[in-house]
Structure formats: structure tokens, C-alpha cells
Amino acid sequence: MYIPAHFAADDATVHELLTRHGAADLITLTADGLLATMLPFAYEPDAGEHGARWGALYGHVARNNDQWRKPALGESLAIVRGPDAYVSPSWYAAKAEHGRVVPTWNYVTAHVYGQLVVHDDPAWVEDVVRRLTAKHEAARLQSPGQSPQWSVDNAPRNFIEGQLRAIVGLELRITRIEAKAKLSQNRPVTDIPGVVAGLSARGDDRSAQAVEHANERREAQDRPGGRRGRNPARSAN
């Protein structure tokens, strides 16, 4: 992935994206070509027993899905997407100053590469199902007016066992991550309030907060003694 230095996501951003996000596009190259599946996943940063710095992603697919049956050639790839949004040039202060502005698209994404391991084991799969359920039920309860938390144990055991037989577990042992947070860091600081206000007015608070936080970090880094000096010539891609 092309990542200009000012859009490179730091470790904390990557960890937050993998921890909070719910699903990824899992892509594998097989002898028959490329295969892809939307994969709900749980991130385990401490799964380093195989020497992986970043840990592993755990998930499952339908037993009828051919992707788990066809061996991956080389690394597999999971594409995790964070907030993304259209950015109108009408939001920039620079529009009124000189008019030399164009639209763009802000986004946060991580390309997670690793060794794909298949777990055709009901006990392993049940553990992952319980992790995923606990994660997303807890997140759901953060919103008001929710029904009580659901647990795997709320369903009849024989029903759960039948459901588990219909899925297969997948583990992506992470070998490397390429991550990008393109959040208007290439714009003059005077343009940032307009971007945040524009996104907020459209109801996209998540993108607005991402822009705000990324540019707060940028300002801290650009101050004397920060991690980098100011570089006025920054790519927009």
C-alpha cells in the first residue's frame, strides 16, 4: 500500500483499529485464483507464541465456503477499514482565500498480512464464537435502550452444537501490517476546523473525531522538539 509518511498510522492507531473493528475482507491467493470473504474477527495481540509481533486475528467461515478448503499460496491478507468519508472543498478555509482546492476522501485502513491456519475443531470454534459474541454484545450495550445481553449459553446446547458444526475456524497469524490514516494531515491547520465541522454536521461523528485526533497528534509532532519538523509539501494521496 502506498503510504506517505504523514499518513502512516502509528502502533496505537493500528491497535485501536484492530481491537474496536468488527470485520475484515479476508483475501487469499489459491491455485484457482483469488478468493475473498467478509470475516468477522477477534484480535488477540498477545498471540505471539508463533513469533508474530502483532499477534493474530481469529474468525470463522461457513463450512460450505471453499476459501478454507483451498490452501493459500504465500501470505493471506485481511483488509480492515476504519472510518471513511468524502471531504468537500467547500469546508476548507483555503476555498475563500484562493480557491485552489479539490475534493478528497479520508479513510483509515490496515492491510494485515499473515499465515492462514484452519481450525476444523468445534472446541476452538466455540471459543472464538464466544469471544466475538461477548465483544459485540458489550459494544451494543453502550447504546441506550438495548435489550439484555445475549450469551451463547442462552440457546439450547444441542442447537449450538449443530451451528458449530456448520462453521470452520480461521486464524491469521500476523506477519506484517501496513496501515494508513489519511485524515487531512496534508491540509493547512486552518482548514481542519472546517473539515471537522462539515463531517459533524453530516452526522459522521466518528470521521470527525478521527480527523480531530489525527491532527492534534500532527500538531504535537510538528512543534519544536516533536517527532518531526514541519514539512509544507505533503502528498494528498
Which ranges hold each PLM region?
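Short, structured beta-strand-loop surface elements
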Residues: 62-128
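Pocket-edge structural micro-motifs
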Residues: 28, 61, 80-82, 174-176, ...
